[in-house]
């Protein structure tokens, strides 16, 4: 197990202030910004720091990536449409909270069933951070194409993320992210570095695409130690293709 263990994003906010620990991407957006000090000029149109390296999207852009919401419509995470009635998300987005709606293009689609991977947690530690959501009615957005069996990852391959970091639908700019590698300790995920931008609270369950627009990962976590954000992680979908096929065929 890695030294700086990555906890569930739903618990991460309580741990961020502790030194020498790693935290996951939490589902909820920041509550508010710090008010300016006396005599300080604050730009009304200034983007929040987590938008560095990203562009805002309107709800009708990239509609295959939607937000998740509880029954009252409160949003808290992201999901990716992979066929008209099935959505992939991070497992922790369905752990301790029940996703009720998948919101695509501003339209609400009721979630009929939630299936967590059977190895989501092993000995209380998140291992397979993935879940399949089944919609009651088909979503008209064009689904994301999944990677094929035998897909080869290579260090330096350009990546693009789409999610709801900070409660804002956003897409990483070209060149911001690239594939870094997979660790022995976490064989079900891959790493990309937060050098020119980072995934953020609310991106959980969002999409990671390669340079051909193929869905290769689901956003899982970020890691912080001693106050330094040093790592972004995504679920490796090549590891779970058989389970995804079985889950979508049975639900």
Regions found by a protein language model. Name each.
Residues 57-61, 73, 81-82, 106-108, ...:
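Extracellular/periplasmic catalytic domains that process cell-envelope and extracellular macromolecules
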Residues 1-10:
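Bacterial N-terminal signal peptides that target proteins for export
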Residues 126-199, 203, 224-247:
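Chymotrypsin/trypsin-fold serine protease catalytic domain
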Residues 10-19:
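Bacterial N-terminal signal peptides
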Residues 90-95, 200-202, 217-225:
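Short beta->alpha transition motifs characteristic of CBS
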